[in-house]
């Protein structure tokens, strides 16, 4: 069974039916790839998907419902734009125009915030960024509200689009990655 435009996936581990999006599982295994186009993602690859794919919610009458992605049993449809990363041979690779940035520790001694605003270290790039001379390990700046938190291999990372990265800091800033304890406990 293959879908024309969507991947068919199954969650790795439990789906979770907790209402907060931060606690919904977003790791899946690819069962089938779309028929309509070729993709770098193959059957059996692990992928990180949007939190609404496996989401369970309650309608206006209080009845428990599956997300629109639900197919049957433990299988779900997943659109191309709902996939952010895929893993093959122990290496995570970005998919499409997504990239992942590690937050950095806040050096401002007058601030109570632990993470610096709008700055990070590129961890997982893509071909668009590489073509612009922005590579993993570079200190970058990004636009406000563009980052979504993900925990990837027990590390807190921000997912964003390539166009959200607006500057590469060329001089040595001595930035240090921030990773909270809660990210390591997942």
Features from the language model and the residues they span:
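Acidic-enriched and Gly/Ser
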Residues: 1-186
């Amino acid at each position: 069974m293959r879908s024309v435009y969507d991947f068919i996936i199954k969650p790795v581990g439990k789906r979770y039916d907790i209402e907060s999006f931060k606690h919904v599982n977003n790791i899946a295994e690819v069962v089938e790839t779309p028929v309509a186009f070729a993709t770098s993602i193959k059957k059996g690859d692990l992928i990180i998907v949007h939190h609404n794919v496996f989401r369970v919610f309650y309608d206006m009458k209080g009845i428990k419902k599956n997300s629109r992605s639900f197919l049957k049993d433990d299988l779900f449809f997943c659109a191309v734009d709902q996939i952010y990363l895929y893993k093959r041979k122990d290496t995570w690779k970005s998919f499409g125009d997504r990239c992942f940035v590690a937050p950095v520790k806040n050096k401002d001694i007058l601030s109570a915030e632990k993470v610096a605003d709008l700055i990070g270290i590129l961890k997982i790039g893509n071909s668009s960024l590489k073509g612009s001379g922005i590579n993993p390990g570079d200190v970058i700046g990004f636009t406000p509200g563009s980052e979504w938190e993900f925990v990837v291999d027990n590390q807190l990372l921000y997912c964003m689009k390539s166009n959200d990265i607006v500057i590469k800091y060329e001089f040595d800033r001595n930035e240090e990655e921030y990773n909270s304890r809660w990210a390591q406990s997942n």
